[in-house]
């Protein structure tokens, strides 16, 4: 018997190299959707992405999650064109996570008076309807004419609209450069998932929330009020509901225009409106607010950063019968004006520096708007005695 095992195996014709190559897709259109989407996500330049989507309708459809993740409308007809596209692709709205809408009122005015406008004079409804279709929207930035204010405000009333919203910026342009009525968008403060809110050039009177409208606790962490005319009682009302507001900034021009009607005269009124248990950073860059008495801030148990003017902190009443009550863990004190223009304030600040370990032991950084050679002598001497260095900026 032969020592070798012989097994007869039927021979198959070898597959030609040409046949193997033919099995491999030669075009992008031959790739599966999942792989196409991976390729599209790797495109770094927007123009490359757009060019790729012009290759075919399939490419355009596959790229929807990337194309519509973040969009911007800078002309009125853009959002109307997008609104029409939702008729054939209703799920497209749910792909959007960030939207920025910014166009001048003059453009909207011209567009609304076009004879063949698809919405006649009712541009507000399709606009708000388009935004409401974005069920996964997280970031909303609005800078549009005041005529759209009420329509957009309705988005914050519904329990299901914008359910994932995390940050929002609202600015409605008035023809006379005036303040828009925040009451029309007041429900934005009741949004349960909103964490960061910026309001620009708005006015709010003492009404705040009506009794039936008041929300439950919200997640608002950061609030910026830019060039606003806000009543202090209304501010107190709308800040009752954020469970853990961490940061607030209130800024205004040196000479507000139009003149203020609702804002208080004294900085104390705004300070009293703020939540004491949670806030960590306060910025009040509002030159026209006066300081009646020295601020008492000891109850602000979490406050670490304070940006303010010296006359607002130490007060302008004379004689000054009370000293500043600094927060227990305040670390950064930033003066937004040149300190020491008032001699009495300069002496009070010098006393604070000399006795920092007693009256403000947690302060590790004090920033002033002065130049280094522009400090009052009494403050220079106090810094030298206590070996404390100011920062200039």
Where are these regions (language model features)?
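CRL adaptor-proximal regions
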Residues: 1-30, 38-42
